[in-house]
Amino acid sequence: MLQVAFGFEPFYTGLLMIPLVLGSLFSKPIIRPIIQKFGYRHVLLTNTILVGACIASFALMTAETPIWLRAIHFFIFGTLNSIQFVSMNTLTLKDLSQHDASSGNSFLSMIMMLSMSIGVALAGTLINFFTQYFGTQHLTIAFHASLICLGCINIITALVFSRIPPNTSV
């Protein structure tokens, strides 16, 4: 969206990934205490909804959005994304024996790559659909509509985490 719809230079767009990475790094030391305090179920349910809302809120971004606001938005998204992935990874692997940990990690990596591939394909399909619907002269609207759809889909997936027993140990 930043390059295609807003016309930003690749270098500028790349610089905006720095706050995302910083958010991810910032979250690392706080994830374990958060999970210990609130539990996997609550963290994953809440965080999935927050990630979805954050994705959808990218639709509020325009070419005129101040850089400091974009940086904060990307920082928050990086933080939430990191909390999500670390929580899912540790929940998935925590009860595996040492013998099964390697296979479990490989299987988890494959599932994550598959889900990311499906996400990219879905995003491309939505952008294509909305570009055809709104026309190429309204590319920003097509991106915004796609982001809202992707955010809503992400929020719906929180239902999966409602199946985690509330007393799941850390």
Q: Each predicted region: which residue ranges?
A:
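12-transmembrane solute porter fold
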Residues: 1-133, 138-168
